[in-house]
């Protein structure tokens, strides 16, 4: 018998996360490592768990995640979006609740490119009046 699972893709900044949701006990595995080991900061772990806590599903699913690209914050945000999308695939009634909390929205902010003749994207050389 095939294992029933729900899938969700999440992206944030330059990070991508593929999230698989299966019935289970609440284990979250990111790139074959437990969540607590993968993310050193408590903030990142909290971000990942937000959709589950909101829908009261912390102990109902085992979550398998493949995250790539970007840094810690970007990956945490990508995983959060992926979990939210997978939860909606599992139960459509959760969508309005997750949307209201802002977990269904893709954060479209990306790094602005560095411009020629400037130090950074917007930082110009110091201006001297005289």
Curated annotation (Swiss-Prot):
InterPro entries (alphabetical): Ribosomal_Su5_D2-typ_SF, Ribosomal_uS9, Ribosomal_uS9_bac/plastid, Ribosomal_uS9_CS, Ribsml_uS5_D2-typ_fold_subgr
UniProt-listed GO biological process terms: translation
Matches recorded under PANTHER family: RIBOSOMAL PROTEIN S9, SMALL RIBOSOMAL SUBUNIT PROTEIN US9M
A cellular component term, taken from the record's GO annotations: cytosolic small ribosomal subunit
Keyword Membrane attributed: no
Ribonucleoprotein as UniProt keyword: yes
Keyword line: Ribonucleoprotein, Ribosomal protein
Entry-linked HAMAP family: Ribosomal_uS9_B (MF_00532_B)
Organism: Xanthomonas oryzae pv. oryzae (strain KACC10331 / KXO85)
Protein name: Small ribosomal subunit protein uS9
Transmembrane segments: none
Family designation: Belongs to the universal ribosomal protein uS9 family.
GO molecular function: RNA binding; structural constituent of ribosome
